[in-house]
Amino acid sequence: MSRGNGLRSGGQVLVDQLRIHGVDTIFCVPGESYLTVIDALHDAQNEIKTVACRQEGGATNMAEAYGKLTGKPGVAMVTRGPGACNGSIGVHTAMQDSTPMVIFIGQVARDQEYREAFQEVDYHKFYGAICKEVVQIDHANRVPELVSQAFHVAASGRPGPVAVSIPEDMQRDMVDVADARPFTTVRSEVGPQAMADFRGQLAVSERPLMIVGGAGWSEKACADIQAFAEANAVPVAASFRCQDMFDNMHANYAGELGTSASPKLTARLKEADLLIVVGSRLGEMTTGGYSLVSLPVPQQKLVHVYMDAAELGRVYEPDVAIVASMESFAGAAKDMEAMSPDSRTEWVREANQDYIDNLQPTLEMNGVDMHAVMDVLNEKLPADAIITNDAGNFSGWAQRFYRYRTFRSQLGPTSGAMGYAIPAAISARLTAPDRPVVAFVGDGGAMMSGQEVATAVQYGSDPII
């Protein structure tokens, strides 16, 4: 066994690894199955902020929002059994949104496993379908190794959640073990042949349409894609709830493909002769139930850029498949020699005009005019304001009429999970305290997570709800 920093409990070693991996905030509901870890977190309170939530779903939704905003794995901790079940909602959201997350779950003592002990759950079975990986740390001397693995898996390739089970007796074991190094994220770099193939498709296209979405973006990647679209006369649509990846005020913006998609935009998608899909999986919501793009071979030429090779060709067969991080592809696209034939200028102008026309309501409102509310918010809120949007029909107002202008100004679950907006807004205000945060939530979502307002008051988070 490697020697490290003297004898430490498994729980202390775990918290030490969190510090090493750059964790500054943890969202949790305390429970008796991980008391040793809680004690170590108390000792580390000057380095790691522990936010004690009112319900585990609130904790995992806050961790998911943190992961979206920062690009780093959000960290949640819940207790065994019922706590793990409550927390699964935010984990599922992280999986469908490709958000990096690590959730630590207390577990029964090792000598009580496989007896259906009090609150025992097999997390490999329960979490296996909604996590990239599920691991259990049975030996305290493996804590550095397996925690590092969890962060690496959560942040690499297609990001997503990893569940780590920590038996309560393992946390008390005393070990002398070396710490891990800070985890690193593996990113794929685009190659010259892939860019040559992409350029070849764009060169012969008269009606290209780019669709941006998914995870792995950065402010630089968004700026580079915008520069590419400008230089090459390509209209850009956003996949479901990803409008903040392209400035909605920009002349190349064509609107969102989702529940509030303009009929003219869906018609334009069908009319396009080339789809350049960057970061999006082309899921059900973006493709109108897989009806807007034919399966498995699209009627258009398809260039599909994604950070994980396993997703390319999984549903739609691309003509050009590019495995690359968003920053790598966007940078290469920006630097590519521009091709902007005059024939595409009108195509871009019409796409943007269709989007602007769709900002006008088609029905008169009775009572509160939500379109007018969105107009006021568009005028009054700064460009970097963060909007958190819950699930339900009401969310269509912010989806259709609010104009997102900067990267990471929208937090919304593509899984359609109700109860997200309030905890996400609380997390956003704690994570980015210099940015105003507005949460849109319906009566159902508010009933599901409204208790987290008490968490907001306790920790000084003050979003507008």
Write out the residue ranges for each language-model feature.
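Phosphate/pyrophosphate-binding active-site segments
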Residues: S2-N5, V177-A178, G200, Q299-S395
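Active-site diphosphate/adenylate-binding microenvironment
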Residues: G11-V15, R19-H21, E32, V37-H42, ...
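Glycine-rich phosphate/diphosphate-binding loops that line cofactor/substrate pockets in enzymes
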Residues: V13-V23, Y66-G71, M95, V153-R158, ...
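A short, small-residue-rich loop immediately preceding and capping a beta-strand
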Residues: D24-C28, I48-V51, L69-V108, I211-G214, ...
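Glycine-rich, anion-gripping cofactor-binding loops and their flanking helix/strand elements
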Residues: K68, G214-V303, R403-R435, M447-Q451
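Thiamine diphosphate
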Residues: F104, E113-Y114, F118-Q119, T259, ...
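Glycine-rich, acidic loop regions that bind phosphate or pyrophosphate groups
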Residues: I105-L146, E168, C242-V348
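Conformationally flexible catalytic loops at phosphate/diphosphate-handling active centers
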Residues: Q149, V153-V204, D357
